[in-house]
Amino acid sequence: MIRSVRRTLLLVVGLVQCLAAVAQRPDTLRIVFIGDVMSHGPQAMAALRPGGDRNNPADYDYSACFRHVRDRFDAADYVVANMEFPCGVTPYSGYPFFSAPQSLAYEAKRVGVDLFLTANNHICDQGRVGIDSTYVIYSRMGVPFTGVYRSEGEEWEKNPLMASIKGYDVAFINFTYGTNGLDVPKPWHVNLLDTAHVQAVIARARERGADLVVALPHWGEEYHLLPSAQQRWWADFLHRNGVDAVVGGHPHVVQPVEFEPPFATAYSLGNFMSNQSDVNTQIGMLLELVLVGTTGGRLQIAEVRPTYTWCSRRRMLEANYTVIPILDWIGRRDEWLDKSDYDKMVREWNAFQKQFNL
């Protein structure tokens, strides 16, 4: 299995190198995806301004979190993030029943995230109140989001989410395997992985003129570096039914990317930002899909570009949590407040590269 994964990762590297010239075409479109944006309790406490009110979202400052990847967002035409928490229910809380200050969502929007994913196993952590609060806050922000809905009619109308990007129509479909055993108030409140429903939504995407269909499943087994048999089954099912790209989340570690044109599958982007520190949970992937127009007017995937990231926790690299591209920071140990975090990053990154022959 590891040998197969190595071949897959090498195939991605080779295709990126061979197709580099494609990215210069005027009809090129770039979509960036980041993994799980978590809101553990220590993250919120680190963002709380000195003397701030814990129940006042304006007293939280998340500006440090995205600053070292902002240039990647700026270079993209569209940025997608998995926002793995209900938003705005006080008192704010971390694991196991999350509720994040809306200032985290506002900061994500400010730095260039264009689409929030909400169908994940924590969306029901605060019950119907949390779903409604998340819906209202994101709607007032004016940021597109997908995965939760307020009525059956709205689910039909807004699922998939259709985004117009540089004149192309891209369909985004976000599903979750479940909600940690918590009840979903109504079947249409949260998109769940169900074969018949998934097929229906993919069909809607094509009927509504999608030039590219992207599925964003919340799936898999936590902390497993290789995709499960169920993930592979679903990936095959999605592609056979009309999905061009699959970009997954939930395992909290990075899993392989497979690019066999015309399809691309990223099984898990891992954590983008969290308080987790177990082996491999601080390594994430910022994934860029480079797309080009076809003679038929649709989009095809020309390149898959992974950027591996490291989530540095409070008082490690900086005073607050921040996410950095690993390769940009190799050799800069002196800049860390706590050198042990640099050493941990290098150690885990070297082991990760060795395991997957990067």
Where are these regions (language model features)?
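Acidic, metal/ion-coordinating pockets
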Residues: 24-358
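Hydrophobic h-region of N-terminal signal peptides that target proteins for export
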Residues: 13-22
